[in-house]
C-alpha cells in the first residue's frame, strides 16, 4: 500500500475516528487544526501537532503534505489552505451535499 501525508481539519469526534484509521494504516498526519479539547488531547497522546483553525491557518501549516482532510468541519477553508495539499482536498461530511449541508445532516437525510 502506498502511504501518504495529510493535514486534518475539524472539531468533532469523527475526526479522531478517521485519524485512528489513517494512523493504523501507516499514513502520516502532519498536523491537526482543531479547537476541540478531546481532539487536542488525543493528538497529544500520539504525537501529532495541533494548531488553531481560522484566519491565517495557511501560515500555521507546513507546506508539502499530500492530502487535506476536512472532517465534519463547519468552516469554509480558503483557497490558500486548500491549495497547500499537493494531491487534493477532501471534505468529509456526514450527509448528502449540498441538500443536507449544516448541522444534524444524518437526521435530515432520514
Language-model region placement:
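One-carbon transfer enzymes
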Residues: 1-110
Amino acid at each position: 500500500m502506498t502511504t501518504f501525508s495529510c493535514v486534518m481539519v475539524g472539531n468533532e469526534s469523527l475526526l479522531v475516528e478517521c485519524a485512528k484509521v489513517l494512523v493504523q494504516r501507516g499514513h502520516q498526519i502532519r498536523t491537526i487544526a482543531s479547537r476541540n479539547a478531546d481532539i487536542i488531547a488525543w493528538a497529544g497522546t500520539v504525537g501529532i501537532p495541533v494548531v488553531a483553525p481560522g484566519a491565517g491557518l495557511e501560515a500555521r501549516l507546513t507546506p508539502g503534505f499530500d492530502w487535506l482532510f476536512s472532517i465534519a468541519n463547519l468552516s469554509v477553508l480558503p483557497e490558500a489552505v486548500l491549495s497547500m495539499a499537493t494531491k487534493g482536498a477532501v471534505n468529509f461530511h456526514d450527509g448528502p451535499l449540498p441538500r443536507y449541508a449544516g448541522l444534524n445532516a444524518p437526521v435530515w437525510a432520514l
